[in-house]
């Protein structure tokens, strides 16, 4: 389980709240979320559609501002930062992996991975060398000069993982990283993320609706109606039952109701 002191944790979230204004109606997307995550954890955030999973991930990643509460990354409060400082944090402390890869289509795999290195204050004599090392590590040593359209979905996602690792971030945040992939490619991507966590001791946080993905994670935080309903590692009996139900629903085609936020 994560450390209790935010100075010892790679991530500390304190009483995080987010209100969304929909016309004249105020919706409480997050209602006082508190969370500690230690370095090297491999954890997931699960819950039904509209529970606040992607909202929480966006606030952790500095992509949006909370209504109230704090987010600390490596002991630094990112909620008090201006946009310029946040941009630096996102470049150097946080890696993002999205469902639809978000690679630049006109750039090769090597160029996509090299790009964030070129914008970092951590100067490297040869950004391309670091990019090649990461792509090699992820089994893409023969795909350096391929553009995204020349790669399979699983290969594109591994390029995205390499890009996320480019500046040695404290956190990798993954929003439905296997949501657009078939089961074989999903397994490959999950193996890659697990390898990153084990070999580089990088903290990986995954938002998922997929019960098979959830069952591979070491810790699961369950959100319901914008607050944490459970936080366990390994899976509790209740969560095992929930995963089993999701598997049954997916098998009968009923899992569609759980797709999207």
Regions found by a protein language model. Give the residues of each.
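Pre-NBD coupling/linker segments of ABC/ABC-like ATPases
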Residues: 1-5
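A short, polar/charged loop/turn motif at coil->beta-strand junctions and beta-hairpin connectors
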Residues: 7-10, 252-255
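ABC family nucleotide-binding domain
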Residues: 9-216, 222-223, 228
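Long, low-complexity, intrinsically disordered segments
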Residues: 255-261
């Amino acid at each position: 389980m994560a450390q209790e002191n935010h100075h010892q944790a790679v991530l500390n979230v304190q009483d995080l709240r987010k209100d969304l204004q929909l016309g004249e109606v105020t919706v409480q997307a997050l209602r006082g979320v508190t969370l500690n995550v230690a370095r090297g954890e491999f954890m997931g955030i699960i819950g039904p559609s509209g529970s606040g999973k992607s909202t929480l991930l966006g606030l952790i990643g500095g992509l949006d501002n909370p209504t109230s509460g704090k987010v600390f990354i490596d002991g630094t409060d990112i909620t008090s930062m201006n946009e310029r400082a946040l941009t630096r944090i996102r470049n150097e402390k946080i890696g993002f992996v999205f469902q639809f890869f978000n690679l630049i289509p006109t750039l090769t795999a090597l160029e996509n991975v090299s790009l964030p290195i070129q914008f970092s204050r951590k100067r490297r004599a040869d950004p391309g060398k670091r990019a090649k090392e990461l792509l090699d590590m992820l089994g893409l040593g023969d795909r350096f000069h391929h553009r995204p359209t020349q790669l399979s979905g699983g290969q594109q996602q591994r390029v995205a993982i390499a890009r996320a690792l480019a500046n040695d971030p404290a956190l990798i945040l993954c929003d439905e990283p296997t949501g657009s992939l078939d089961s074989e490619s999903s397994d490959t991507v999950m193996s890659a993320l697990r390898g990153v966590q084990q070999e580089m001791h990088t903290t990986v946080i995954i938002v998922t609706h997929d019960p098979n993905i959830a069952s591979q994670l070491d810790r699961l935080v369950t959100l319901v109606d914008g607050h944490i309903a459970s936080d366990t590692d390994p899976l509790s009996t209740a969560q095992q039952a929930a995963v089993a139900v999701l598997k049954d629903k997916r098998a009968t085609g009923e899992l569609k109701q759980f797709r999207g936020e």
